[in-house]
Amino acid sequence: MENNAILSALSARKSVRVFTPDPVTPDERAAILNAAFQAPTAGNQQLYTILDITDPALKAALADLCDHQPFIAGAPLVLVFLADCRRWLNAYHAAGITDARKPGAGDLMLAVADTCIAAQNAVVAAESLGIGSCYIGDVLENAEAMRDALHLPQYVVPACMLVFGRPTEQQQRRPKPARFAEKAVVCENVYTDRTPDELRADFAAKAAANGQLDYDFDKAVQAFCKRKYASDFSREMTRSAEVYWKEFL
């Protein structure tokens, strides 16, 4: 569809990790947060809390905890999105419901979905204002230290972190990486595994779209596995996620 501003923004959006010194204005911050609040939410519960990180020392601590990424500390706007199963539990208690069950795994999954939907609304709103963003998945690591740093109580779990700012000219010029084609990620009615040959074709097509014409599937996937899936930070993320999950089981 031509001349659709929302679709154009969604297609153009890419992660930005280098920002100009210009601040995110109070009006822009308010618009980004309001967009998050307007996101679809299960039962209109808004099962999340958003931390606006304004303390430079805390920004620096988060940058260190999140795989030592200094650009986090320098971002004009840093928001941590927490899956919050505590607010409604406290409301139940305040309403005199003494036998309210503790939140379970299903409640956490619903809250994480709510939280990530709100976060993506914030990303799209920022993009419409010319403000770039980057998701920081490493906020799931170092559960104990993260709980201490953010004063997280029981039944409150970090789902994602976002940094915002105006992209530099270099970041604006940087091409967005191509995605998989539809056939690689969409199944009709039921889940269907891609065959090894189909996987090779899917990955090669994406690589070609990104200008990698000499793509070697085995070499590339093995390197990615070593760098990401089998990495120390990935193992730490899994360990920390299990720490958070335990209180819901």
Give the label of every model feature segment:
Residues M1-L249:
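Acidic, surface-exposed loops and disordered segments
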